[in-house]
Amino acid sequence: MSKSLTIIWQYLRAFVLIYACLYAGIFIAGLLPITIPGSIIGMLILFVLLALQIMPPQWVNPGCNILIRYMALLFVPIGVGVMQYWDLLRAQLGPVVISCAISTLVVFVVVSWSSHLVHGERKVIGQKEKKNDA
């Protein structure tokens, strides 16, 4: 009985913390003069709490595992909603595909550039050093 209560408590705590970050993000999004989805702000809040080790990862791990396990199922209503507007999407399919492709390439370039900027050039262990004959 005690083990069952402990497991229930762990799942309850995980979902309460995840939803608290979500609703805090929604609240903050309502206060901002620009439009940023509250769920994105909530994820950033959760990330900051975990990165600064204010919240231990094991507190949210059970809830995250459940959400990840059933993530594909959670996208079904979104896909059905998109299919309701298939006529509009079909009329604009070319621009949508082009914008997705261009934005993907931009993300690749920005991530590559920022990674090189942050990490710089490092010596590879076991690789011989190049001699500069100038």
Curated annotation (Swiss-Prot):
It is a multi-pass membrane protein. Belongs to the UPF0299 family. Keywords: Cell inner membrane, Cell membrane, Membrane, Transmembrane, Transmembrane helix. NCBIfam families: PRK01821.1. This is UPF0299 membrane protein KPK_1586. The keyword Signal does not apply. It is found in: Cell inner membrane. GO terms for cellular component: plasma membrane. The chain crosses the membrane at residues 5-25, 26-46, 66-86, 93-113. Pfam families: LrgA. Its main location: membrane. It comes from Klebsiella pneumoniae (strain 342).
